[in-house]
Regions:
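Class I S-adenosylmethionine-dependent transferase superfamily signal
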Residues: 30, 104, 126-130
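Alpha/beta-hydrolase-fold catalytic nucleophile elbow
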Residues: 88, 107, 143
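Conserved SAM/SAH cofactor-binding pocket of Class I
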Residues: 1-99, 147
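Flexible, glycine-/basic-rich loop-and-beta segments that form/coincide
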Residues: 184-188
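Mobile active-site "lid"/loop adjacent to the S-adenosyl-L-methionine
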Residues: 91-122
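Conserved Class I SAM-dependent methyltransferase catalytic core
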Residues: 117-183
Length: 188
């Protein structure tokens, strides 16, 4: 969805932030597919950032994938300077977290998976923080659990009042697994 958005909106040099970059899969793929893009990958985990760095080196995009340790969008200091914020944030609710197979629960850091009782603690913060960094017309794209959570996230974006074109997209397994929204122009 992000690649199509860049093409239809003719963004010549996309400035992208991948929040919760983890291994760098999204950041590295976007840099590889969009040769003029500059991607900032943010994570609170130093270990994750090291893995992302290795993956960017391996795929030859390290010069356009910058990495920063921080909480959500805190490393982005300039307001309205980003074209796209992408994230696969922690979105599992407590019940779903408890039902995961033990090998998943025990392998992945809990903070990378669970977003609190309803799974949306990080998503709520990311919606609010994105308003500060996205340029007018910029795109927010997040992976979510789908199902009822998709409708809830769409409602959160609408309630924020700064987003338009809120759309839920399916993945191969379920509807509503990715949500995209464009930020409205500022009214200042």
């Amino acid at each position: 969805k992000v690649l199509a958005w860049v093409k239809t909106h003719e963004v010549p040099t996309p400035r992208i932030v991948d929040v919760g970059v983890g291994s760098g899969a999204i950041a590295v793929t976007l840099a590889a597919e969009l040769p003029t893009a500059v991607v900032l990958g943010v994570d609170i985990s130093a270990e994750a950032l090291e893995i992302a760095k290795q993956n960017a080196d391996t795929l030859g995009v390290r010069d356009r994938v910058k990495l920063a340790r921080g909480d959500l969008l805190s490393p982005v200091k300039s307001e309205h300077s980003v074209d796209i914020v992408v994230s696969n944030p922690p979105y599992l609710d407590d019940a779903l977290m408890a039902s995961l197979p033990r090998d998943v629960r025990d392998f992945e850091p809990r903070g990378a998976l669970t977003g609190g009782p309803d799974g949306l603690d990080v998503v709520r913060r990311l919606i609010t923080d994105s308003v500060r960094v996205l340029r007018p017309g910029g795109l927010l794209a997040m992976e979510i659990a789908g199902g009822e959570q998709g409708a809830t996230v769409a409602a959160l974006l609408a309630q924020n009042g700064r987003f338009s074109e809120v759309t839920l997209h399916p993945d191969l397994s379920r509807p509503g697994r990715v949500v995209t929204a464009q930020i409205l122009p500022t009214t200042e």
